Amino acid sequence: VEGLLAPDTEPRYAELDDGILLILREVNTHENADPHDMISLRLWVGPARIISARLRHLAAIEDIKVALAKKSGPGSVSEFLCAVGRNMAKEKAEILAGVIEDLDEIDEDLAQADDTKTLRPRIAKLRRRAIQLHRFFRPQRAAFADIAERRPAWIDDSAADELAELSAEFGRLAADIEAILGRAQVTQDELRSLENQRATDITTTLTVVAAIFLPLGFVTGLLGINVGGIPLAESKAGFWVTSGALLALGIALWLYFRNRRYL
């Protein structure tokens, strides 16, 4: 009873004297739901009785209810457990496909985007989603594996085989999530490297511009002092000669930095 009514539960399997306790968690797929929200499903299963407890509607159970209403649902306890596992694995595979699609879009945007400011929160959100899913994939894999390996007498061989396959499926989903987390980390590293490179390029450009204008400013400063003996001060062509010399100096500095690959 405590396991069925606990407010916060982790996926697990436990054997009791007259049945088994199976606790699973599913992603909340309802409209406007928080994608990080998880719904707990608590099942007490005996030879001829199933007691389920949940605080909110769960798609995996709703599908079974619809099938039973149409007289096409599971006909035994074993079939019910397999149906629950199939529905959960299917829903999680669809959610995982959506996460992969989001990551593909981020990678494509990273390769094309000039502005990467919007990519960082998208990657962070995707990683949080993947971590949340990964947190429950492996425990659910272990729960279904325990049912298949330590199965009660009322679970037949075919159901045990399907439960074992479901355990393997959750294991594959967990491996896929780990691969997604690895890809997301690589994408985040590429984004960080791109941002660092852009910052370095901007700093280098500003430094080169300052290096070009510093000697020009020094020369014009010398020519602007109010003392006698300034060259070309009395010449009508002095302004143009000085401007040409400064322009030539600026071009020479620009060519120097360009040849040194600073530009």
At which residue positions do the language-model features occur?
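Long amphipathic alpha-helical coiled-coil segments
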Residues: 147-160, 184-196
